[in-house]
Structures are given as structure tokens and as C-alpha cells.
Curated annotation (Swiss-Prot):
CXXCXGXG motif repeats lie at residues 146-153, 163-170, 189-196, 203-210. NCBIfam families: DnaJ_bact, PRK10767.1, PRK14276.1. This is Chaperone protein DnaJ. The gene is dnaJ. Belongs to the DnaJ family. InterPro entries: DnaJ (IPR012724), DnaJ_C (IPR002939), DnaJ_domain (IPR001623), DnaJ_domain_CS (IPR018253), HSP40/DnaJ_pept-bd (IPR008971), HSP_DnaJ_Cys-rich_dom (IPR001305), HSP_DnaJ_Cys-rich_dom_sf (IPR036410), J_dom_sf (IPR036869). It comes from Streptococcus thermophilus (strain ATCC BAA-250 / LMG 18311). GO terms for cellular component: cytoplasm.
Length: 377
């Protein structure tokens, strides 16, 4: 049977080497990866490329595909599918089938591309930056593909070889004696640590890991209206992938520093305004600070402490709605702690006019008088 579709997807002939297959995949994944290419159909194209690579990069799957097509690569190889207890082109040996009933299952191709790890970075914002938005430069260290060996882990001029212990599978079978008899299970290969490949002559830059630490700087736009705990995802700014896989993502976690004037809940900003009892009784026009600048607000005569006024549109923007929140101003009437004689007389006259003739000012003792004198010095 002439099965060439997977080779065609990678632009290769059927006699392509593993290095050619890997290079073709890396080239095409950079072109069609959905984090890079936003055109319609790019994601579907990338999935087709990945499917072809996962099959052709595995020697057993490739042999099954060449003989039986896609069904053979997935374990259904037609007349030769069962093969025998020593393994065939489709299913593995009897022990592999048996182990699948006990959690073994099919093993993943150790050389298949895998996305890199995600990273997290916490950024601190001032109260105002969170309200209006900001642009921040973030500096951090991450694992990137080693430039010396292009991620292979091998010294330039050499290549990794198929692991002699697991024969490229990344796992080995281990026999264990149980009350039910001898059981066989699969464990990660202790030589290649699951990669399926051995590096005889490692790269001196990355010491065989295929990756190296590098300082990285990225600019992130903080949208207006963010709050503590919210995250911004920067695709592809995490750590390098494995076997040609894409980079992971960077998650920027927001932390908003408190304000010495305001508090906030969502798009609503809160402010406490201190006024005198004279202003509360007679009314006044006062200046109130907001994040948008000072505004004038009318205090009606007879305002009680705890009264809340709403300043429309003076809050924070709603993160997804786009409209502006409000600022709520709560009045707090401040009682004076020091009065001169004229002020006391005026208040006593006010009390008498109000019918509160029983009001008797507290007389200060000697020590309180001394304290007042010292405070005035």
C-alpha cells in the first residue's frame, strides 16, 4: 500500500531520515502554530502537521503507517494487526495488552513535541495604574532553546542516538512477583529518562538538556480597570518546548497597592469626606478628590454623618463593559477637640436657643490645663 499523506504534509519523501522529519516539523510548526499564525485554517493545518510528525517520528508507528496507513499507526493494522504474542505491526505483545488492563495502556511517543512550561510573574501596580491602565516592562529568566545545539542536547556535529535500553520507547517493562503471579508493568527508562534517546557527546553549553537559562524582557499592556488577583496571559512567553514543541505561556498576576485616600470594589471607588458640624448643619460646597481630579460637591444643610453621595462617572472603568463606574463619598462629621472661649460661648448660646439649657461644659482640672499649655508651646 502506498501511504504518503503524512510525508506529504511534512513535504518529505518516504525515505526521509528522522533528522529530516524533525527539521521539517520545526519549520512548519513555526509557520502554522496558532500562537504565531492567526489566519483562518492555521490551527487545523498545525494539527495535521503534528499528527503526521507524531506518527513518523516513532519507528514502530511509522512502520505500521507505511504498511497499513493511518489505521495501522493507531493500532488497527488489518490482517496483520494482532501479529502474535511477540508483538506485531498493530498491537504490541500479549504483556502490553495485559498491562493496559492494569493502568499501563499505550505509551506516548517520547520524542513527540511537547509545549514548554508556563511561568508566573507578579506585577505591582499603584492604585491609579490599576484604574487607568499602564504599560510595564517585565524582566525575568526563562529556559530557551539552546542556540549551540538547536535544542538537540548533542554536541554540534553529532546527534542523539536511539536509547539502547528501551529501544527508543522511553519506557521499559519490569516484572514483579504478586499474589496473582508474575505481573509486568511499564516504567520510565532509567537510562534516557523517558526521552527514547541517548546523548553520547552532550552539548557543552546546555550539558545535554537542549535548553539554557536566559534573561528575557517583555512589555505588557495592563488594561484599565484591573484588580488584584487577575491574570494576563502572554502566549509563547514561557519556557521553551521539548522536541520542537511550542513555548509555554507567561501569566502576569496583578497586585494593586492600596491608596492612602481611596478604596475600591470593582468599578466603584469609595472616599470618606471629613466635614465640620457647622458645614453639616448649614450646608456647604466642598472640593472632593477623585482619581480624575478634584470636583465640587454640594453638602446640603442638615447632612448627617454616614450620608453617602454619588459622583457619577468618577470611578474606575469596567474591565469588560467599557463604561465608567462611580465614586461614593461618605460624610463623616468631625467633632472639634479644642475650643476657645468665644467658640464655647457661641455653642452654649446655640444650645440655649435650641432648648438645651442643661448643657454643662466639663471643667478642666489642673493637669489638663497644664497639658493644654504644653501642647500650645
Amino acid at each position: 500500500m502506498n501511504n504518503t499523506e503524512y510525508y506529504d504534509r511534512l513535504g518529505l519523501s518516504k525515505d526521509a531520515s528522522q533528522d529530516e522529519i524533525k527539521r521539517a516539523y520545526r519549520k512548519l510548526s513555526k509557520k502554522y502554530h496558532p500562537d504565531i499564525n492567526k489566519e483562518p485554517g492555521a490551527e487545523e493545518k498545525y494539527k495535521e502537521i503534528l499528527e503526521a510528525y507524531e506518527t513518523l517520528s516513532d519507528a514502530q508507528k511509522r512502520a505500521a503507517y507505511d504498511q497499513y496507513g493511518p489505521d495501522g499507526a493507531n493500532g488497527f493494522g488489518g490482517q496483520g494487526s494482532f501479529g502474535g504474542f511477540d508483538g506485531g505491526a498493530g498491537f504490541g505483545g500479549f504483556e502490553d495488552i495485559f498491562s493496559s488492563f492494569f493502568g499501563g495502556g499505550a505509551t506516548r511517543n517520547p520524542n513527540a513535541p511537547r509545549q514548554g512550561d508556563d511561568l508566573q510573574y507578579r506585577v505591582n501596580l499603584s492604585f491609579e495604574e490599576a484604574v487607568f491602565g499602564a504599560e510595564k516592562e517585565i524582566h525575568y529568566n526563562r529556559e530557551v532553546t539552546c542556540k549551540t545545539c538547536s535544542g538537540s542536547g548533542a554536541k554540534p556535529g553529532t546527534s542523539p542516538v536511539t536509547c539502547g535500553r528501551c529501544h527508543g520507547h522511553g519506557v521499559i517493562n519490569v516484572d514483579t512477583q504478586t499474589p496473582l503471579g508474575m505481573m509486568r508493568r511499564q516504567v520510565t527508562c532509567d537510562v534516557c529518562h523517558g526521552t527514547g534517546q541517548e546523548i553520547k557527546d552532550p552539548c557543552q553549553t546546555c550539558h545535554g538538556t537542549g535548553r539554557e537559562k536566559q534573561s528575557h524582557t517583555v512589555s505588557v499592556k495592563i488594561p484599565a480597570g484591573v484588580e488584584t488577583g487577575q491574570q494576563i496571559r502572554l502566549a509563547g512567553q514561557g519556557e521553551a518546548g521539548f522536541n520542537g514543541g511550542p513555548y509555554g505561556d507567561l501569566f502576569v498576576v496583578i497586585n494593586v497597592n492600596p491608596s492612602d485616600k481611596f478604596t475600591r470594589d470593582g468599578s466603584t471607588i469609595y472616599y470618606t469626606l471629613n466635614i465640620s458640624f457647622v458645614q453639616a448643619a448649614l450646608g456647604d460646597t466642598v472640593e472632593v478628590p477623585t482619581v480624575h481630579g478634584n470636583v465640587e460637591m454640594v453638602i446640603p444643610a442638615g447632612t448627617q454623618t454616614g450620608k453617602t453621595f454619588r459622583l457619577k462617572g468618577k470611578g474606575a472603568p469596567r474591565l469588560r463593559g467599557g463604561s465608567q463606574g462611580d465614586q461614593l463619598v461618605t460624610v463623616k462629621i468631625v467633632t472639634p477637640t479644642k475650643l476657645n472661649d468665644a467658640q464655647k460661648e457661641a455653642l452654649l448660646a446655640f444650645a440655649k436657643a435650641s432648648g438645651d439649657e442643661k448643657v454643662a461644659p466639663q471643667k478642666k482640672g489642673f493637669f489638663n490645663k497644664v497639658k493644654d499649655v504644653l501642647e500650645d508651646l
